[in-house]
Amino acid sequence: MILQGKKVIAIGDRDGIPGPAIEECVKSAGAEIAFSSTECFVUTAAGAMDLEIQQKVKDAAESIGADNLVVVLGGAEAESSGLSAETVTTGDPTYAGPLAGVELGLKVYHVVEDELKAEFDEAIYEDQCGMMEMVLDVDGIKEEMNRVRG
């Protein structure tokens, strides 16, 4: 179980899966929301994670602890999702924000990944994410997330 009993940082995407949709899914899997946000990844520099969100992630990791925290992304594109995943694991690859050079090593998944979907209430996932899943490059996102996680 990835989510059961964990605190989740939900980072949604205006053009992908928004934060509130991720929240509903992860709550159905027995997780608690540490914080949630909906970003516009194409609005930020080169798809990098917003600097304010980086600080919130850093603060949450310090107060909750990396072992009790899971980041769930909702990015519309594989590349921006990968950048966000890298940011919360090995540090900000753009060296622009509070996580530049900071290896938090957080567990990170995209909401469309099978490992997470298996834990969600199926009806809630379908209601919250089903339509967007049809237009996202799910295979590309899964490949990128697996690449980042190694």
Swiss-Prot record:
EC number: 1.21.4.2, 1.21.4.3, 1.21.4.4
Keywords: Oxidoreductase, Selenocysteine
Highest taxon in the source lineage: Bacteria
Matches recorded under InterPro entries: GRDA
Pfam families per the UniProt record, alphabetical: GRDA (PF04723)
Record flagged with keyword Lipid biosynthesis: no
Active-site annotation: U43
GO CC annotation: glycine reductase complex
One Gene Ontology molecular-function label: betaine reductase activity
Keyword Transmembrane helix attributed: no
Catalytic activity line of the entry: acetyl phosphate + [thioredoxin]-disulfide + NH4(+) + H2O = [thioredoxin]-dithiol + glycine + phosphate + H(+); acetyl phosphate + methylamine + [thioredoxin]-disulfide + H2O = sarcosine + [thioredoxin]-dithiol + phosphate + H(+); acetyl phosphate + trimethylamine + [thioredoxin]-disulfide + H2O = glycine betaine + [thioredoxin]-dithiol + phosphate + H(+)
Functional note: In the first step of glycine, betaine and sarcosine reductases, the substrate is bound to component PB via a Schiff base intermediate. Then the PB-activated substrate is nucleophilically attacked by the selenol anion of component PA to transform it to a carboxymethylated selenoether and the respective amine. By action of component PC, acetyl phosphate is formed, leaving component PA in its oxidized state. Finally component PA becomes reduced by the thioredoxin system to start a new catalytic cycle of reductive deamination.
Family classification: Belongs to the GrdA family.
The protein's assembly and partners: Monomer. Component of the glycine, sarcosine and betaine reductase complexes, together with components B and C.
HAMAP family per record: GRDA
Annotated protein name in UniProt: Glycine/sarcosine/betaine reductase complex component A
Organism expressing this protein natively: Gottschalkia purinilytica (Clostridium purinilyticum)
